[in-house]
Amino acid sequence: MSDNTTLPAPASNQGPTTPRKGPPKFKQRQTRQFKSKPPKKGVKGFGDDIPGMEGLGTDITVICPWEAFSHLELHELAQFGII
């Protein structure tokens, strides 16, 4: 046993050499973009056909939003954030 063999250096118990990663980072969600356009205000079929309102034109501003969107269902109003 007079061989002069060299033994490798003892392996270190430090684990992998890649840097340790922290917790996952979440991206901030951007505002939702609807594929369809939001509904337009105004009641369908509302205009000069009201007695006593002749001459005012069909550009009638509706004060109550429920009247402005009476042709829509509640889930449609909620989808676009109207209610």
From Swiss-Prot:
GO BP terms in the entry: positive regulation of epidermal growth factor receptor signaling pathway; positive regulation of G protein-coupled receptor signaling pathway; positive regulation of MAPK cascade; visual perception
One of the record's GO cellular component terms: photoreceptor outer segment membrane
Ranges for region Disordered: 1-51
EC id: 3.1.4.35
Record bears the keyword DNA-binding: no
Extent of Polar residues compositional bias: 1-17
Compositionally biased intervals (Basic residues): 22-43
GO molecular function: 3',5'-cyclic-GMP phosphodiesterase activity; cGMP binding; enzyme inhibitor activity
Catalysed reaction, written as an equation: 3',5'-cyclic GMP + H2O = GMP + H(+)
Protein keywords: cGMP, Hydrolase, Sensory transduction, Vision
Subunit text: Tetramer composed of two catalytic chains (alpha and beta), and two inhibitory chains (gamma).
Disease: Cone dystrophy, retinal 3A: A rare form of cone dystrophy associated with supernormal rod responses. The disorder is characterized by reduced visual acuity, photoaversion, night blindness, and abnormal color vision. At an early age, the retina shows subtle depigmentation at the macula and, later, more obvious areas of atrophy.
Protein family: Belongs to the rod/cone cGMP-PDE gamma subunit family.
Purpose: Participates in processes of transmission and amplification of the visual signal. cGMP-PDEs are the effector molecules in G-protein-mediated phototransduction in vertebrate rods and cones.
Domains (record comment): The C-terminal region is important in conferring inhibition.
Protein name, entry field: Retinal cone rhodopsin-sensitive cGMP 3',5'-cyclic phosphodiesterase subunit gamma
Native organism: Homo sapiens
